[in-house]
């Protein structure tokens, strides 16, 4: 009986964890002032914020990602995090 109860508890915990999805701010360039929250797709476990400087000033993009984007260009700064609304 104890084994059955323990098994049910473990299965419940695993099933509840599978249903979790991240919530990240999402915006592109000039719309980043508002910072609208988006429920990320299944498998997207990172929130990210990319920023870089241009002639018109600093540009920002925020969103969800399955893997943390890499800063491949000099001057591109990337922040990745794994909690809701962290970007």
Curated annotation (Swiss-Prot):
Keywords: Acetylcholine receptor inhibiting toxin, Disulfide bond, Ion channel impairing toxin, Neurotoxin, Postsynaptic neurotoxin, Secreted, Signal, Toxin. PROSITE patterns: SNAKE_TOXIN. One of its GO terms (cellular component) is extracellular region. GO terms for molecular function: acetylcholine receptor inhibitor activity; ion channel regulator activity; toxin activity. It comes from the Eukaryota. Residues 1-21 form the signal peptide. SUPFAM superfamilies: Snake toxin-like (SSF57302). The keyword Signal applies. Expressed by the venom gland. The keyword Signal applies. Disulfide bonds join 24-47, 27-32, 40-64, 68-80, 81-86. It is found in: Secreted. Its main location: secreted. Inhibits carbachol-induced muscle contraction in a reversible manner. Belongs to the three-finger toxin family. Ancestral subfamily. Orphan group IV sub-subfamily. This is Long neurotoxin homolog. It comes from Bungarus multicinctus.
């Amino acid at each position: 009986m104890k084994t059955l109860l323990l098994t049910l508890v473990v299965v419940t915990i695993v099933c509840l964890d599978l249903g979790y999805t991240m919530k990240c701010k999402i915006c592109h360039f000039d719309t980043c002032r508002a910072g609208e929250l988006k429920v990320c797709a299944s498998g997207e476990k990172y929130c990210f914020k990319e920023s870089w400087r241009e002639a018109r000033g600093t540009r920002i993009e925020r969103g969800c990602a399955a893997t943390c984007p890499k800063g491949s260009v000099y001057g591109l700064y990337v922040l990745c995090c794994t909690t809701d609304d962290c970007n």
